[in-house]
């Protein structure tokens, strides 16, 4: 009974925390995402939420640009990237996590290339948004959900690492689920609307 309950809870968590799109990779490989190029816009950060309204004086123009550009990437490519990641995870799981099965390595390489490209774009922006507070040395973002962008970037690096190490689909799922949580926070907060 205990084993059955544990399996049920684990399955429920795995199903409930993955990204919504689950299509298998077309032809076994994901198409390359175009290199994202940010553009000027009238977007501005949300300073109405406490404590970000108090931290507004700490925000630099570089942080505003970093969040605007991260949001533009999010609006343009996050959904497609997560669909590819989940599609690959399901494809790998359907092959019983055998990386030597036909098409698995090529599909993993294609998705990893897109994840790496996205993480490379977000890396300097995420680090600009997530700063160290003095004197207590805690880390935070003075912009609303800037920390979520940082955590999303980190999860993408971990997904790439797990694909590079040919981990089983269930191991990759932990980072996919966490990336999906941060993606939902960003999307549902509306912080990127109009970027």
Functional labels for PLM-detected ranges:
Residues 8, 16-20, 36, 53, ...:
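Low-complexity, intrinsically disordered/propeptide-like segments
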Residues 25-70:
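N-terminal low-complexity, Pro/Thr/Ser-rich intrinsically disordered segments
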